[in-house]
Amino acid sequence: MDFFKKILRRNLMSKKITLIVLAFFASIFLVACGKSPDVTANANGTKIGDTIKIGVNMELTGAVAAYGKAEQNGIKLAVDEINKAGGVDGKKLELVTKDNKSENAEASTSSTNLAIQNNVNAIVGPATSGAVAAASLVSQKTGVPLLTPSGTQDDLTVDANGTKKFVFRTTFKDSYQGKVLAAYSYNNLNAKKVVLYYDNASDYAKGIADEFKREYKGQIVTEATFASGDKDYQSALTKFKDLDYDAIVMPGYYTETGIITKQARDLGIDKPILGPDGFSDAKFTELAGKKNASNVYYVSGYSTNVALSDKASGFIEAYKKAYNTDPNMFAALAYDSVYMIAEASKDAKTSVDIADNLAHLKNFVGVTGKMTIDKDHNPIKAALMVKRDNGEEVSAEAVEIEK
């Protein structure tokens, strides 16, 4: 009998060791795969400690890295300034940065890690609407507010239940951009007939196009679409060339619209090209070519040609000193986002307090203008229409449209 007991104990011990080894390697595998922690683990928000921890969930590599890198620059500059001035309530701001690689799934994972593992008190980013939509679900579950500098999709801050308590934006909505494009093309450029050409694979572009169609008072001669990642637009552009119209309205990101503009100009199409804030990056000019990036107009939340507040000139000077280039819209919006979070962090004890304070932010003056957060967590502020010639911003006009 003792013999059989020894055998049984030996087998049980062997199985236990095997299970321990398997569990060890499984944990390594999950870490290697970037497995996210449980997003429900911190649903009541995070406490503010010795520092105010700001997570950065940004597109630093991948298809739209130009947006993310500009926003990262604006974020770092703002944090440096605030910390040099003594911080907030005597506490320094601390950055924790994650690269979402311009991928929506990675944006969700980045926010989860920032909220659960790093215990940040607020998150700035992502830059693009699809990534924000994915990351916002995490903020809603963890109680860590997300402030996107440039995510414009209308439903980012609201859902079927109403306003999302922990999701905010610093820029205007897609529908507002569509209204601005419709009014500016018809009234300012006297474009009574247009071609509408937009990215049908992008919710951002489709949202702007839909609102443009609702608001435009002129005739849309033809409506055509392209898809993110396309490289050859000759077929559609050749058809446009033979039509009678005054301008091309082209909702989309610079990754495609810069190439389309080059191919259009190469075909001899010299009509005005109008687009949303997705045009607002030097990469647009790089893809189109300086000469081709002329007679181009786009919506923007910022321009170095217009001082939207008394803070504008100081920001431009500081940014150029830090990065040896002029700031674009994305850098300016991200810079303002940090200052908004800093303002909302005053007297706050938790991330939930920061969210509550952001929701009641009024008459905040940033480099992108004066703004108040409305009931849907969108800023009430003016938009600009910027003109680009030979690859450079040559003018900008403030456009006020009823929202």
Placement of each model-derived feature along the sequence:
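C-terminal motif of bacterial Sec signal peptides marking the signal peptidase cleavage site
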Residues: F29-A32
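Beta-alpha junction/loop-to-helix N-cap segments that form part of ligand/metal-binding clefts
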Residues: D38-A43, Y67-E71, A85-V158, F226-D230, ...
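Extracytoplasmic "Venus flytrap"
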Residues: G45-G74, K98-A105, A127-T128, Y197-K206, ...
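Hydrophobic alpha-helical segments within soluble ligand-binding/sensing domains
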Residues: A107, F168-K193, K206, D232-Q234, ...
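Extracellular/periplasmic bilobed ligand-binding domains
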Residues: S139, I208-V299
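Extracellular/periplasmic periplasmic-binding protein-like sensory domains
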Residues: T261-Y335, D389, V399-E402
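Segments of small-molecule ligand-sensing domains
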Residues: A322-A331, A342-E393
